[in-house]
Regions:
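Compact structured core domains
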Residues: 22-70
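Broad, structure-driven detector of short, well-ordered beta-strand segments within folded domains
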Residues: 15-22
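Nucleic acid-binding interface residues in structured DNA/RNA-binding domains
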Residues: 2-13, 65-174
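Beta-strand secondary-structure signal
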Residues: 4-6, 17, 27
């Protein structure tokens, strides 16, 4: 059974939706996000302990604090490539960013590959089912462009501002 809960965010952000299996968080996304269909129901509305834990984490995060814990989440349909990309995303510190190309270079080096596609990395980043917890919003295009965020460019900008970035240094999509 899949459970669902709606999380009202502070002003300046779209609200969020979360799903869980009864023990683990399995999805966290902005309401109306591109690709939200991958989280489609049917759901049972319930406020589970993992939703309470995730809500507490989000409350702290949206107040500009760095929570000292991570809610229990479980990612389904995880390929080895996606896992590698998501592990790199989890290692991007609060207040820092990386480009898709930098992530690709890390994978090249680790696997001893002659080349890794930044576009393939982008596909894996876009697949992330638990946004913010796995901080895909910290990934930029090669020229510092704010591209490829399924939660909406406005939310990406707001998240980066919340983390202390001067977003005027980034390039906005046209």
């Amino acid at each position: 059974m899949v459970y669902h809960w709606h999380y009202p965010t502070p002003e300046g952000f779209s609200d969020m939706e979360m799903t869980g299996d009864g023990e683990f968080l399995t999805g966290l996304w902005f309401t109306g996000a591109r690709g939200a269909g991958k989280h489609s129901g049917p759901w049972t509305e319930a406020f589970l302990p993992v939703f309470a834990e995730t809500s507490q984490w989000l409350d702290l995060y949206f107040r500009g604090q760095q929570p000292g814990f991570v809610p229990k989440f479980q990612i389904q349909n995880l390929t080895p490539f996606r896992q590698e990309v998501l592990e790199i995303l989890q290692a991007i510190p609060h207040g820092e960013t990386m480009t898709y190309g930098q992530i690709a270079r890390q994978i090249e080096k680790k696997q001893g590959l002659p080349q890794m596609s930044a576009q393939a990395v982008g596909g894996a980043v876009g697949w992330n089912p638990v946004c913010i917890l796995i901080p895909c919003h910290r990934v930029l295009g090669a020229n510092g462009s704010l591209t490829g965020y399924g939660g909406g460019i406005e939310n990406k900008i707001a998240l980066l501002k919340l983390e202390g970035h001067d977003v005027s240094k980034f390039k906005l999509p046209k």
